[in-house]
Design a protein with these regions (language model features):
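Conserved N-terminal catalytic core of the sugar/cofactor nucleotidyltransferase
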Residues: 1-7, 14-18, 34-108, 114-119
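Donor nucleotide-sugar binding loop of glycosyltransferases
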Residues: 12, 33, 145
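Short alpha-helix within the catalytic core of nucleotide-sugar-dependent glycosyltransferases
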Residues: 118-129
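Conserved donor NDP-sugar-binding/catalytic core segment of glycosyltransferases
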Residues: 131-135
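Single conserved hydrophobic/aromatic residue that forms the stacking wall/gate
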Residues: 137-146
Length: 146
């Protein structure tokens, strides 16, 4: 059974920008020819993954759909977060979607992390796929890396 990716894409980027009026969430910042959200979508365009579920708020719908079109992803589900409540409620709401088979493994990915070695990321998931029921992928915070 394929793994269902759930992309957490509701962050507003307020910790990144001091001027809250003129900021863009880091997952949508254009770094020339790519964004972090775009890279996340590329990572899941692999035969081990089912179509994505994207958890976000209504401010980002247009940007998300633009990225989905650019990556030629036609099948997806968007969950709207009614209020900013951090990660746990977004994970819970995605896990409760009735159309997801009970035994389908889920992987929760943040939309604003850079994973440069996509081949190793996918290889590791594929290697352990038969043991997975749920996986939350996070990377260390900058202060943990020092």
């Amino acid at each position: 059974m394929k793994i269902r990716p759930v992309i957490l894409c509701g962050g507003s980027g307020t910790r990144l920008w001091s001027d809250k009026k003129h900021h863009q969430p880091k997952q949508f910042i254009d770094f020339g020819n790519w964004t972090l959200f775009g890279k996340t979508l590329e990572r899941i365009q692999n035969s081990i993954f089912d179509y994505p579920i994207i958890s976000t708020n209504k401010k980002y719908i247009r940007e998300i759909k633009k990225h989905l079109r650019l990556k030629s992803i036609k099948k997806y589900k968007i969950i709207l977060e009614p209020a900013k409540r951090n990660t746990a409620p977004a994970i819970l709401s995605a896990a409760l979607i009735k159309e997801i088979p009970e035994n389908q493994p889920l992987i929760f990915l943040t939309s604003d992390h850079l994973i440069e070695r996509t081949n190793l990321f996918n290889k590791s998931i594929k290697k352990h796929q038969k043991y997975l029921t749920c996986l939350l992928y996070t990377s260390p915070s900058p202060r943990d890396s020092v």
